Amino acid sequence: MVDLKTKAFDFSQNFTISLDGPAASGKGTIGLILAKKFSLKYFQSSIVYRQLAFDCINQKIDVTDIDAVIALSKELNLDNNFDLENEDIGNIASQIAVISEVRNNLNKYLINLVKTTLRIIMEGRDIGTVIAPDADLKVFITANPQIRAERRYKQLQAKGKTCILDEILRQIILRDKRDKERKAAPLLPASDALIIDTSELSAIEVVEEITNYIKNKLT
């Protein structure tokens, strides 16, 4: 872990950033820009849940069959070329993420990835509180649900996908409720996280704020 008291911070050394927040808050775009700026490996923790959701669909496993979902979570394989970003998969991923045993199994994969990667920014819901509590920098991104729904709508439209704004908003509100109320690692910022509301900010403006924070606090 980086010594926060050092006066000459060297970005060539080991460095871990946790980037948490609700769905469609802008984490992905911000994380990718930060990863490029500071030469970090970028990883979305949601991919492991989306992969499991895809596997459930592919193997015709009902998400209410908890034992079957738990068993499948022990055999995770991320090596595929399928599109995991559609809203149906995201909704199922949110449902299975509330299963404690599933989170425990997938968290082992994520924790090991953080420990074995020297320079990484990991994005998710509980990275700063569960996966990487010793991260050098913890950031929590949030935004108004309506703004987030509009962002997701534009993203999907840009990919040529058919979508309905009201339905996206409904799903975001539902996922927020599920994420915040789940017993296993509910969505909340770490006590020492930098919290940024991106409702009125562009991704570049958020990156600038984080960069200034790093320069002021970590150097």
Curated annotation (Swiss-Prot):
Residues noted as binding ATP in the record, renumbered to the chain? 21-29
| A GO cellular component entry from the record | cytoplasm
Q: Which family does it belong to?
A: Belongs to the cytidylate kinase family. Type 1 subfamily.
SUPFAM superfamilies (UniProt xref)? P-loop containing nucleoside triphosphate hydrolases (SSF52540)
| First-listed, main subcellular location of the protein, grouped into a coarse class | cytoplasm
Q: Name one GO molecular function term.
A: ATP binding
**Compartment annotation:** Cytoplasm
* Record key words, sorted: ATP-binding, Cytoplasm, Kinase, Nucleotide-binding, Transferase
Q: What is its EC number?
A: 2.7.4.25
Q: Which domain of life is it from?
A: Bacteria
- Which InterPro entries does this entry report, sorted A to Z? Cytidylate_kin, Cytidylate_kinase_dom, P-loop_NTPase
Q: By its UniProt entry, which Pfam families does this protein fall under?
A: Cytidylate_kin
Q: Which organism does this record belong to?
A: Rickettsia felis (strain ATCC VR-1525 / URRWXCal2)
Protein name, as recorded? Cytidylate kinase
Q: Name one GO biological process term.
A: pyrimidine nucleotide metabolic process
Enzyme category, top tier: transferase
